[in-house]
Every structure is written in C-alpha cells, then in structure tokens.
Amino acid sequence: MPISFPVDIQTLYVTGGKDKTIFYPQVTRMQNQTLENFINQSIVQETQALINQQVAEMPTTVAEMLGSFEIKNNQLNVLSLSLTNYTYHDKAAHGMTYIRSLTFDLVDGTHCSLEDLFKPGSNYIERLSDIIKAQIREREIQLINEFTAIHPNQDFYIADKALVIYFQLYDITPYVFGF
C-alpha cells in the first residue's frame, strides 16, 4: 500500500547565475486551494526574507548563495518545514547560514506560532527555557552569553511528534557549535 501524506511537495528553484541558486518547496494538489495558496505564499515570502537578510547584512558582493529546505513533518495534519539560506560574501572569513521554519495546522488552515502549540495562559516560555538550560548544562555547551530564556517567537519546528527549538548562529553559541 503506498504511503499517503497530507500534502504533496514539489521542488522549485530560482537562480541568479553561477553559484546562486535557491531551492524551495511548493505544496501541490491540496483540496483546499485557499490553504494551498496561503502555504505557498508564506514559503515564498519567508524565502525572500532570508535572501534579503543575507544581502542587507554585508556591504560586499555575494559570491555564493544556496537556499534549500527540509520537510520536518508531513503527517497528522501538520506540515512543518525549514528553509535554509547559506551565503558567502567576497572576502568574508566564512559564509553565514540562517534557518527559518514554518509550521501549518492543515485542519484549521493556520500558520502556527510557538505560542499556538500551548494552552492559553500556560507558562510555556519558562518551562521550555528550563529544559533548554538543563540541556546546555548536560551537554556542556559553551555559550557566548548566559542563556536566560527563549523568546515568545522563538524559532522552532515539529519533527515527527517532537518540538524542536533552535537558535540562529551566534544567538547563544559560537559559530563552531552550529544550530
């Protein structure tokens, strides 16, 4: 029996010449065309925001830019994906990567924020922050500055049945630690 996912995904791309290619997902063949358009528009907007962020941060010429994506969850009426943009500027010490994630409730037809995953009034920021602090201690992760708490709009995605909280490069750790 073939596996059936809530949404079908195809890969699209745009290129700006040699060494500048952005791959991004497009949702297809959904019964709810309004939701399909909303998801695809959200993906394009976030992909463009990543490009804009990379170009705006450095006054030097972009030598290389690669955009990619990962589908983190496509089951149980939840679509969660991560968009990645790596850019290297001329004469930079190294390239920079940013990741942005989008999570959609396919039943309600909504884009989910971290807050949406918890009951109203719950102290999710403190609880998640405590878990992260414990993991930092257990893994002996070197921090740039002391970690106090996540932000209400903290980056996250859903992978299978797990909530994954992540930080951008340099947010809390040196570059070498990655995401």
Predicted regions: what is each one?
Residues 1-179:
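Compositionally biased intrinsically disordered regions enriched in Thr/Gly
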